[in-house]
Amino acid sequence: SEFGIKSGYIKYKKLGEGHINDTYKIYSSEGVFILQKINTDVFKEPEKVMQNIDFTLSHIKKEMLLNGENPDGRFPDYIKSGINNYLKYNGFWRIYKYLENTITVNKFQNTDIIQQFGKLLGSFHKYTESADITRLNITIPGFHNISENISRLFSFNKNAYDYNFFKKIYDYYISNRYILGTKQLVHNDVKCSNILINTKSNMPCAIIDFDTIMPGYAAFDFGDAARSSCTDDNKINITKLKAFSKGYFSAGCSLSAKACSLGLLSITAELASRYLYDSITGCNYFKNINASEKLNKFYSCLLYTSPS
């Protein structure tokens, strides 16, 4: 009711796939909504997260309209509580209307779906290239700082992990990071489960979960998305990667193929380092998986990023 939803509550369902926030699907006589409690251990200043989301959605919708596209149904619309689109009450809460006829899945199998996923991300980057990144808050300092996140492992016992692998990746990244170009507004967490699938067309229709939006490199978004959608049995599926790349570049964004390649390698190695760091130190960024599962995910990342 704090968000102005007056009609009767019917039931709720906890959605458990997210690593960070607590998410619930709320059914009421007024409609279906998605309610989230933001993890303030990860997002120390959640108000700034919502400021970034407001700025991003406003910018993209304006760009879409200028290009003759309809933004309706393409993004979550957050509901206000008073003057804000969030509520502070025993935590930090927000709610938005459930986008009808949509689902999320953890993996895409069909190359047509993967190609459309690439096009959706390419369109996102095309529209965010012109955004003024000085307007964005840094909500997670050091997030996707590849060199910093990998090099922090170097202080641990070299026998505790694959030191040589990370040293090779680190040196290669430092030598080639100029390829990445300039920073722009990016999503920073593009993966299959953050894409809505329209159940009528069976095609990706919207990107969600904008909490990590900050200035960054579009190549890292490309790499994150390709890692999530184009791997089978811990190996890159070239057919899927070609489909994803075809869709991405068809959207007209300006990223180079070399930058995309470096983004895929770097972001996957960084993810491996984060799983390993959590496992070694007992940190709890990935709150829904235990130490053993983190190690398994670390090894999975190693399998498809190990240099030849």
List each model region and its residues:
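Juxta-kinase regulatory segment immediately upstream of eukaryotic protein kinase catalytic domains
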Residues: 1-5
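Conserved N-terminal boundary motif of the eukaryotic protein kinase catalytic domain
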Residues: 8-12
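Protein kinase glycine-rich loop
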Residues: 14-17
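Active-site acidic catalytic loop and adjacent metal/ATP-binding pocket
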Residues: 19-28, 34-35, 173-220
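Conserved ATP-binding subdomain of kinase catalytic cores across diverse folds
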Residues: 22, 40-140
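ATP-dependent phospho-/nucleotidyl transfer catalytic cores
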Residues: 44-47, 103-115, 132-187, 192, ...
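Active-site activation/catalytic loop segments of kinase-like enzymes and analogous catalytic loops
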Residues: 219-252, 267-286
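Conserved small/polar residues in nucleotide/adenosyl-binding loops
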Residues: 304-308
